[in-house]
Amino acid sequence: MQYGYTLPVRGPLATADGVIGMARHGEKLGFTSVTAADHIVIPTKVESAYPYAADGRHPSQGDAMEVLSLLACVAGATEKLRLITSVLILPHRNPVLTAKMVATIDVLSKGRVTLGIGVGWMREEFEALNAPDFDQRGAVSDEYVAIFKKLWSPGPVEHQGVHYNFGPVRCEPLPVQRPHPPIWVGGHSKPALRRTARYADGWHPIGTVPTAELRPAEFAAMRDDLRRMAEGYGRDPFSISLAFVPRLHVSATPVDGADRMPFTGSAAQLIEDVETYRALGVTHLSFDFRGPTLTETLERMDWFAHEVMAKTRG
């Protein structure tokens, strides 16, 4: 099992000391990756429902570091950590510029980028960015992935599509990773599974939250759907990685009850949950250890590394 953790893009830890401190500490502890989320602006009036909160409200009030800039900084401050966008909202940015930025970070990090992608949920943010039509975001995202793969190939290349066009161009340097950095798709909807099956190298859903529990039986059913879809596209279904993002709730004593949410409870229960999802095919788990202070955050990382990660890495 490989383990990653969330870097702060907002709040009191979203500083140079906070981001770099967490990244370097995690690398020393043996974590394999860091993730960072993507928002550019938060309009003052948002009616769109955040899909991972029971009340539909997103926790940010507008503070959000730009994710690719943040990961470029972390690339220079670390040597081994994989750098994962979790997730990059594809329609928010020009696809040619995005391809160039991702390739540049991959070159400077010596091949450590994983591009986690999503289609977005906040209509108001799309409008503020003058992004493509929110209701076409799925089709736009699919086309942008195709553009990325072209631009990450030896040129010249061109693209004549529904949502974007360009004539013959070269876009170099190419990414270090060939044929391209791994692409993981976030989300657990049918369109997200289809997008993963057709285009991606990994499935990267959030789980163990009230609106997306993804308990073992549900996760297994979605995994099976994904693999059937992949076969339908002529792909090896087992070539698609399963990278789960559960919410973590640690307690000093075991949590009782049949309705206990996975990754809630004592160290022994967390270890059991790791093994359960490993048996389902999950090879990467990412957690959010952020606390009120950097000291408390690093202590949480220490605890998990010694009490759970060290006992489940094999």
Q: Which residues are covered by each model-predicted region?
A:
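Active-site-adjacent structural elements that line small-molecule/cofactor binding pockets in enzymes
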Residues: 1-314
